[in-house]
């Protein structure tokens, strides 16, 4: 059987040198957008992917903001790699939480898949950069069920709604410059 270039191991890939035809290398870099602490996958997700024959590369410290250490990812089969460049160079699919920053867009390549929240309307230069990269970008917020439901956007909307009340309550406190009011009364 001839192996296509897509299925050959690239020199920059950590770990094994042989690749199966159906294996996908999934990469997860550390989020670099200001005030973003989430990670695009949990150890449970890594275990599921590796159980189905895929490789998962996690950048060192990618889960730290979510209180997930590298050892937790490695314990379920992830390969921990030192930098974002290692993730982008080897991964067929890159998973992120937020839209890629310009330095990340520069690392994307034709044929690579990026799966993340994009929200590109506010970022025309980044949108053009994604087009120019030749990568396929899939926005979480556009994944739609036949019913029209947006299963990847709904949980974020619910969290935002709950956080709005909490943030509002904080700003009513005197130390935050508010009038010292309590939501719900005393």
Segment roles from a protein language model:
Residues 2-5, 11-25, 31, 102-186:
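Glycine/serine-rich phosphate-binding loop and adjoining beta1-alpha1 elements at the start
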Residues 13-129, 133:
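An N-terminal-biased, well-structured beta-alpha scaffold segment characteristic
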């Amino acid at each position: 059987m001839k192996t296509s270039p897509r299925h050959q191991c690239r020199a920059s890939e950590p770990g094994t040198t042989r690749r199966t035809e159906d294996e996908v290398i999934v990469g997860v870099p550390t989020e670099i957008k200001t005030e973003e602490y989430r990670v695009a996958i949990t150890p449970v997700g890594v275990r599921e992917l590796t159980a189905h024959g895929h490789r998962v590369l996690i950048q060192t410290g990618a889960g730290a903001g979510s209180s997930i250490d590298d050892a937790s990812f490695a314990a379920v089969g992830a390969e921990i790699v030192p930098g974002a460049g290692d993730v982008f160079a080897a991964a067929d699919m890159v998973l992120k939480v937020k839209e890629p920053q310009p330095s990340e867009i520069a690392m994307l390549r034709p044929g690579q898949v990026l799966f993340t929240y994009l929200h590109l309307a506010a970022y025309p230069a980044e949108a053009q950069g994604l087009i120019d990269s030749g990568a396929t970008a899939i926005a979480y917020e556009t994944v739609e069920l036949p019913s029209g439901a947006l299963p990847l956007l709904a949980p974020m909307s619910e969290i935002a709604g709950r956080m709005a009340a909490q943030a509002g309550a904080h700003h009513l406190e005197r130390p935050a410059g508010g009038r010292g009011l309590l939501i719900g009364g005393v």
